[in-house]
């Protein structure tokens, strides 16, 4: 915990601190190395590695950035329409892709809209709510969902993609509808 608190002062990435802590725990821990390696959630780690590779490719090839450009073309710069498009597009994409590259792509877009005089506060909220709540729609939409699936399966209670989708997607849609109503009342 101290390492994470001091990583900025120490100029060490938090991933290095986490890895160092894991190695220390492995060395001083009472569990055998083999048991520890067997307890690692390898399918989840491999899944996220592959997901970040695919999403990274989409970012590098400009697919996500082109999608953001399409959103701007569709809305014509109208603030309320832009807010709703950002909310719904970020929710739907976050249900199927990792939301971090999408959010990272949308940040400069929203900043440039602010530079042009548009009130960006509603757009930040739309992006945040859409990206966060959209992850509830599918099993791969959020890291926690994938971890849940792995742990659940390991304990004899597998959750399939379709089982999760039947519950998660309607809940996501209801959440985004409620967010839309709130944001229209608050910002329109």
PLM region descriptions:
Residues 1-69, 167-188:
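Hydrophobic transmembrane alpha-helices of multi-pass small-molecule transporters
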Residues 14, 18-22, 48, 52, ...:
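Alpha-helical transmembrane segments of multi-pass membrane proteins, especially transporters
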Residues 44, 49, 99, 158-161:
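Generic intrinsically disordered, low-complexity segments enriched for polar/acidic and small residues
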Residues 128, 143, 162, 182-184, ...:
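Alpha-helical transmembrane segments of multi-pass small-molecule/ion transporters
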